[in-house]
Amino acid sequence: MKNKMLALILAGGQGTRLGKLTQSIAKPAVQFGGRYRIIDFALSNCANSGIHNVGVVTQYQPLALNNHIGNGSSWGLDGINSGVSILQPYSASEGNRWFEGTSHAIYQNIDYIDSVNPEYVLILSGDHIYKMDYDDMLQSHKDNNASLTVAVLDVPLKEASRFGIMNTDANNRIVEFEEKPAQPKSTKASMGIYIFDWQRLRNMLVAAEKSKVGMSXFGKNVIPNYLESGESVYAYEFSGYWKDVGTIESLWEANMEYISPENALDSRNRQWKIYSRNLISPPNFLGANAHVEDSLVVDGCFVDGAVKHSILSTGAQVREGAEVLDSVIMSGAIIGQGAKIKRAIIGEGAIISDGVEIDGTDEVQVVGYNEVVGVATDED
């Protein structure tokens, strides 16, 4: 039986711009909003859009990501006719090859895709924060009789040179693609979300491999090839909240935006939930000295200090006399007595010793996974 659409989430990037936060884990596994990991948004969008088969393409530091995804049950993707498959580089008869780019990762997994037998493939990035109904995008793809549909977001003209820009005609058919142009002709930025007719994409990737034509990345190679070949390529305009959290500053900004009860992600919308794999934790404990204001505090936290406009992830501790302002404290991190944290991201399991001050007023500060700042005590 032919499946309608298979989603492939590209989650193998190293995320070097996130510095210490991705030294031990893949970028899509980085925590967000206290309760989630970044990849939860793409997985939840798939589940909410009625996509039952998902492949997650991994490469760099995949252990935490693989453990988080498991069998897909947290997203309802563990049924008889559904599932999540973790796709990692492997040694084949022609030799061992790491994924060389986004489209090369798809080529290396042709056998898996053929086993699902989809009519369409949906290509997603695993490191963006947003909500999207992919079924609406698929309907647009069908209505336009497109070979390829690219999701685009209207961005300010002054920022357009940071993105791949799609120039379209009056019917939203893409006539030109410009990769990070110095003088952009439009403001329709690619979101890195694509729907392809699978057989057409398959034929192109196989032909390119046989002829040794470089076809490693969608933006650099595949989209220009489709346009040059006269394929019908259309833009799908998205107007909701979307955030590329590939830098420390953008990750911090997205978390701060998420604190607001009226945040653009509409996190309390029960019609489009964001699911995650959440371990059972005890209730929060607020001590006699605790003062919590305008913050998100997740299960299992211990607070006996002051927390303002911040996020405390599962099991985080803010001890007596400590102050946390405009910061993200990830799971299991400990803020010691009298410590002061301002505009910072404190990684999972990190320890900020008693009396330490971290001030990100000029630039958001980061403490890495399990990093110790100051002299840890036996109590830590």
UniProtKB/Swiss-Prot annotation:
Coiled coil: none annotated. Its EC number is 2.7.7.27. Alpha-D-glucose 1-phosphate binds at G164, E179, K180, S190. The keyword Mitochondrion does not apply. It holds the Pfam family Hexapep_GlmU. This is Glucose-1-phosphate adenylyltransferase. GO terms for biological process: glycogen biosynthetic process. Homotetramer. Pathway: Glycan biosynthesis; glycogen biosynthesis. Keywords: ATP-binding, Carbohydrate metabolism, Glycogen biosynthesis, Glycogen metabolism, Nucleotide-binding, Nucleotidyltransferase, Transferase. It catalyses: alpha-D-glucose 1-phosphate + ATP + H(+) = ADP-alpha-D-glucose + diphosphate. CDD domains: ADP_Glucose_PP, LbH_G1P_AT_C. It comes from the Bacteria. GO terms for molecular function: ATP binding; glucose-1-phosphate adenylyltransferase activity. Belongs to the bacterial/plant glucose-1-phosphate adenylyltransferase family. Involved in the biosynthesis of ADP-glucose, a building block required for the elongation reactions to produce glycogen. Catalyzes the reaction between ATP and alpha-D-glucose 1-phosphate (G1P) to produce pyrophosphate and ADP-Glc. The keyword Magnesium does not apply.
